[in-house]
Amino acid sequence: MRRFITSPARRAGEVICAFFLLLSPALAADEDTDLNLIPPAAQAAPPAVVPVPASSATQRNYLEDAFTFTPLRNDLLVPYPPPTPASWEDRLFLDSRDEWNLGNNVTLDYSGRFNLRAANDIPFPSHESVRNDLRELFLSLQPDDSTWIDLGRVNVKSGVAVGYNPTDFFRTRAVVEPLTADPTILREDRLGTLMLLGQHVWTGGSVTAVFAPKVTQPTAIYTNIDLPSFDPMLDRTNAQDRFLLKSSVAVSNDFSPELLLYHAGDRTQVGTNLTVGIGQQTIAYVEWAGGGRASLIADALAYGRQTGTLPKQAPPVIPADATQYFQNDLAAGFSYTPVDTKLTLNLEYHYHEAGFTSQDWRNWFNAAAQHGNIPGVDPALWYIRSYAQDQQEPETRHSAFVRADWTDAFVTDLELTALANINLQDGSGLLQATADYYLSRVWTIGGQATLTFGGRRSEFGSLPQAGGILLRLVRYL
């Protein structure tokens, strides 16, 4: 057993070391210091929604064409049920983020993405070729200089970490057709939740209250070939009543802890966000949430039965502890910006107590080997992992995350981003590198390469996607 634990940990350490060695030229780059490149979430525990006066509102609209090629593995130990991931896809979309001042301290905010898409597994033309994602649409009222009230669909984000946010409670089911594995982009591009939000700020603190009503019943997890065209998909965001109360108070000049209380359905969670500066270049942060719940496996099987995807009376395909008890989620790390560079590095440790243990992973693979010939077993096994992805939960209990962002890398107007997500239990992982070059104020070209690695009996080595290549062209309007 000791050999099993040590080897993946060593491999994970080697990957992290190699990650930083690849970026070492940036540490000596002679650029202007830009501490603003530290992710805003890591600078201090902010309010749930940062209030922006209408006079400072901006409009951001652009056209983008993104072509993705995804090589697939054909030697999976656990066969992936249909539909298999698309091997290629092209998406042309109009992305809009607009705000209009209606007068009397009232603004109307809209964020959405209109998609035209073609893929090897989608008939063209068809209703799947045209899609619209309504991310946000809400009225914002400012009764006084320190109070804001929002009504409508709002993307509320919480958390100080980068790779995983335990206190980002409204993340569940909100990500639709992601083009990247970068969590900082997924947080911005996801669906908002229909809600009433109130916020009050004062010198040294803030308080935010949110109520999101249930307007529909829970639905089955969507696949790539059954996404609706113009449905706002409130079933993804408003299938249960949800409440959030959060407050931050400045204890000192550089320490403003944030406390959160969240309730959804029959479960209650508490959380906190803590940041502290270490010198001029480093910020350490801790994000924690905890509450009563069952294991990820039990939750997935229960949701599958509730929505009709899995037979109600079928026994669990692998052992699942349905007992609800207090479980913890943690993201701890630091952000570092070297002197005289435009580079920001993040290194984090993630703990998801409800996630797969090493024994759970062995059970998952063994169930397929022993019972995969029984109809429904392999789809049920993959459903558990699809549920984790849909909920934006880590699949495994222990993981590490590394991210680097370098603006004006080597030449002006070139931005490089790289990240790694590593399972500390089996040493498998995902690597992604992105390059964007800003040709002018209105044109950008970019590329992205993704690689999953690990043994066939590992989290990432068992995925059908071996990696991916994305090419994009952006025209700002």
Model region roles, listed by residue range:
Residues 252-254, 275-421:
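Detector for outer-membrane/organellar transmembrane beta-barrel domains
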Residues 25-87, 93-97, 101:
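N-terminal periplasmic/intermembrane-space "pro-region" immediately following the signal or transit peptide
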Residues 202, 400-404, 449-451, 463-477:
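Outer-membrane beta-barrel "beta-signal"
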Residues 86-92, 130-135, 190-194, 201, ...:
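Residues that define the transmembrane beta-barrel architecture of outer-membrane proteins
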Residues 104-109, 146-149, 204-209, 216-217, ...:
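Repeated loop/turn-to-beta-strand initiation elements of outer-membrane beta-barrel proteins
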Residues 61-67, 110-112, 151, 198, ...:
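Membrane-embedded beta-strand positions of outer-membrane beta-barrel proteins
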Residues 99-216, 249, 454:
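Outer membrane beta-barrel
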Residues 65-71, 78-82, 111-116, 122, ...:
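Transmembrane beta-strand segments that form the barrel wall of outer-membrane beta-barrel proteins
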